[in-house]
Structure formats: structure tokens, C-alpha cells
Amino acid sequence: MTYWRSIFLVLLGACSYGVLSIFMKHAFQLGFTPFEMSGSQLIFGGLIMTAMAIFFSKQRFSFKYLLLLAPASLMMASTSLFYHQAVSRVSASLAIVLLFQFTWIGVLLEAIVDRKWPTAEKWVSLAMLGAGTVLASGLSESGIQSVDMVGLIFGLMSGATFALVIFFSGRILPGMDPYLRSAISISMAALMLSIVYPPTFLVNGQLLQGLLPLGLLVAIFGSVIPIFCLAVGVPRIGNGLATILSAVELPTVVLLSNFVLQETVSLPQWGGVFMILAAICVPQVKWRKLFSPSHALEQERM
């Protein structure tokens, strides 16, 4: 039961990150900048998780955790920074395709570290994810025209750093209390981002102009829920599978765009959504067992 609960939590975290796009789009329409929103996401997320850790964590804080979790926090802050830079330079559809390179990067990273070649199921799943991502993003219809190379590089870097976020979630202190771990990781990521982009929105009156409620929403759906779910789920199911499951983020974005934002979703995009969902299920099917003679005999007896 713990295994399937962990799968559910990773899926929930990825879906939550997909919901983030709804609030981000509304925030940009109101005139808030990507840096104000990413800063709000991490700063408010860190405060919320710190409060939760104070009340619910069963593990005591130690300064050594700051050093051990620093790589995860750095990748978290980098993903936010790189992705927003990519969105500002290339189309949204291309940016999300570039971000979704985390799927094969994550599986490859696990294979290199563990010195274990990915299973056939994972290769099939990755191929389906690649095709489904291009279709669901709408890139197959709009095409790529005069791509900004700087934006392209930032997009690929966001995919690489997000793969490392998932990787570190399963490798660094896997048995650590998830409340304390999430609080430290998000808070340090907020501090790192603030060094590059000082959070002037905290003192320039933007919070009272509508940024506060939006900042809290992006913090909950973009930091608190996904990071906590990854902290709980990834150590129990492994990095490779968690990376593939996290691809459910894109179908969530497409579904919300259609039903909440009332945006038109084409037939190829729907096909991409179903292909991604099918790809997520592939690693869970025991194909060799399913087609083995013993399994067929078992089915006949039933």
C-alpha cells in the first residue's frame, strides 16, 4: 500500500505544479513580472512549510541539513529562474517541451549513477512521452520559427535542473522527515533566488496591489504541495519512475486550459494528452509476466 500511496503522491505533486500555470497566467495579465511570481512562490512557500514543520515535524533541526540539502535547493531555485527566462524568450509551447526534457534526463541520470540500464518498459514510456509532449504542447501544429537560442538554452537548463530536483529528492536524506526537509529546501531556494533577484515586491507596495493572494496560491501549488509530495514519494518508488510519473503535469495544464481558461484544445493535443497518460502507465505493467505461459494458464483456470 505504501508503494501505491507514494505513486499517488508523486502524481499529486506533478498535477499541483500543473495547476500553477493558471495562476501564473492570471498574474502576468495583471502586470506582475516572472521574478515577482517566482520570488513569491519560494518565499511564501518557505514560510508556509516552516510553520507546518514547527507543528508537525517529528525530527529536530540540525545545521548539517542546510549543507546536505543545499544542492536540492540550488536546483529548485535554478529551475524557477531558468524556466521563467525561457518563457520570456520563446513560445510557451516550446518552453514546456524544453522543460519536459527532464523525463529522459532523469532516467539517464539514474542509469548512470546506479550503473543499471533502463528497462524496456521505461524506454517505451520515454518514447511515448516524447511524442505525446510535442503533440500536447501544440508544437507539432505551430512549428518552430526563429527560435531565440538563449531561450532555447535556458529551457534545456530548466529541464536538466528539474531532473536533478527529482533525483536529489530520492537520494539525499531519503529517510528525513518530509515536513522539515521541505521547509529547509524551499527556504534555502528562496534565499538563493533572492540573492540574484532581491524581493523588492515585499516593500514596494505590490503585495497590497493583488500580489499577496496570488503569491500564496502559487506558493501552495508550486512549492508546498509538489515539494512535500516528492519528499514523501520519490524515496519509496525511485527516481526513474518518479520522473516518468511527473510528466502528468502537462496533461493537467492542457485540461485546465480547456475547462478553466476556455482555451481551444485541438484533436492532436488531446491525442498527446492520452499518449502521455498511457506512457505513465507503461512502467507499471509487468509485461513479461502478463504474456508468460504461466499467466495465460492462470487466466484459463479463472
Which stretches of residues belong to each language-model region?
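Hydrophobic/aromatic residues within transmembrane alpha-helices
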Residues: 27, 37, 41, 86, ...
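Specific transmembrane alpha-helical segments of multi-pass solute transporters/efflux pumps
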Residues: 16-21, 56-94, 99, 133-135, ...
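C-terminal transmembrane-helix exit sites in multi-pass transporters
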Residues: 48, 53-57, 83, 102-127, ...
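Glycine-/small-residue-enriched transmembrane alpha-helix faces in small-molecule transporters
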Residues: 1-36, 40, 74, 78, ...
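Helix-helix packing/entry segments at the starts of transmembrane helices
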Residues: 8, 40, 95-101, 168-191, ...
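C-terminal-most transmembrane helix of multi-pass membrane proteins
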Residues: 42, 138, 211, 247-302
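Hydrophobic transmembrane alpha-helices of multi-pass small-molecule transport proteins
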Residues: 49, 70, 121-140, 193, ...
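Hydrophobic alpha-helical transmembrane segments of multi-pass integral membrane proteins
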Residues: 4-9, 35-52, 121-131, 150-157, ...
